[in-house]
Amino acid sequence: MNEQGLSEKEIFSYLENAKSEDTDYYRVLSSMCTHPHKIAVEANRLFIEANLGDLGLFAGASRLEQEVVGMLGELLHAPSIDVPFGGSCESSACGYLTTGGTESNIQAVRGMKNLVTTGKKELKGAPNIVIPESAHFSFDKVADMMGIEVRRASLDSEFRVDMASIESLIDANTIGLIGIAGNTEFGQIDPIDKLSEIALENELFLHIDAAFGGFVIPFLEKPQPFDFKLPGVTSIAVDPHKMGLSTIPSGALLFRSASFLDSLKVNTPYLTTKAQFTLTGTRSGASAAATCAVMKYLGNEGYRKNVQYCMQLTEKLVIEARKIGFEPLLEPVMNVVALKVPNPDFVREQMLERFGWNVSITRTPRALRLVLMPHNTLEDIEIFVQDLKEVTVEI
């Protein structure tokens, strides 16, 4: 650190130089995040100093968090939506705002483990969870942090988790199952209704990672079942900072009942509240304000239009790609496309180096992974496909 302070002009010149090194979303087709809505940005600024880790000092920010949990509970068909954070909610859905899907997934499995430890089920060995091969890498962190064995079930021909594989991996030490509602690589939705049945039959917890799909699936023309409407679903992760158009970081974790939240409780005797249920201590009240503001501003109608627009982009991409001879691995159910192209690694490299397009690659099979977000336009899609044609004609 410098001895003498710099001027504002020097500081902002320095910051602008750093900002110029960042990638603008203009030609990004690989990210599940996007520009936050302007009202979310303004709300974030208004509550920039609010710390939800000390709720008694920031009652207003705390109330906004409660409202977000309530709105998300309504969206995801929770048993009850009027639940004060940390309050009494014995037969109602509870939750809190997290930094994103990784924290939500960690906390959901931590809750499973704690409830099993204090419950009637006796394990004969290390606890395990069964997840799809398509699950997010955050579950690798779960295994490392908590000493939980992670068993990976294979996928079917449509890149959804295979039910027979799930059932074959369950044993006496299994504490829970994971379902994905919008997997990162293919945008596919696991058969959550079937997972719900298996979870109930085996008395297992079922956590749904809907970090991306949570703000997409409810607004599709033909939504698939994935939320608390299914009786076996015990927790759901959803990220407002993705298709919810809030500021980063803004995630959320909802539980079906208070017992899950209570299993995460630790005493905090020197704060204005007696206990915390969260993973992090200090938490952003600004994120709560941003999420509350954008959800109230857009409403169901606004989010429906947002999803319709992204699905229009998705359809446009598939149509234009077919014109130059490239097919998707499967028909997209969400705004994620896996496109079959020759030598996808080379294509990815060339699209970035020559035209500035940021795309990614699926693992198995290897294909171009493209995410169509609100920052993209129909014109972007036409230009992208023309650039793709120019790159692939040389292979």
UniProtKB/Swiss-Prot annotation:
Residues that bear N6-(pyridoxal phosphate)lysine: K242
Catalytic activity: L-tyrosine + H(+) = tyramine + CO2; L-aspartate + H(+) = beta-alanine + CO2
Any matching Pfam family: Pyridoxal_deC
GO biological process, one term: carboxylic acid metabolic process
UniProt-listed Enzyme Commission number(s): 4.1.1.11, 4.1.1.25
Pathway per the UniProt entry: Cofactor biosynthesis; methanofuran biosynthesis; Cofactor biosynthesis; coenzyme A biosynthesis
Enzyme class: lyase
Cofactor(s) listed: pyridoxal 5'-phosphate
Disulfide bonds: none
Keywords: Decarboxylase, Lyase, Pyridoxal phosphate
Statement: the UniProt record of this protein carries the keyword Lyase: yes
Signal sequence extent: none
Keyword Lyase among UniProt keywords: yes
Family: Belongs to the group II decarboxylase family. MfnA subfamily.
Function: Catalyzes the decarboxylation of L-tyrosine to produce tyramine for methanofuran biosynthesis. Can also catalyze the decarboxylation of L-aspartate to produce beta-alanine for coenzyme A (CoA) biosynthesis.
Listed NCBIfam families: tyr_de_CO2_Arch
Protein name (Swiss-Prot/TrEMBL): Probable L-tyrosine/L-aspartate decarboxylase
Native organism: Methanosarcina acetivorans (strain ATCC 35395 / DSM 2834 / JCM 12185 / C2A)
Gene giving rise to this polypeptide: mfnA
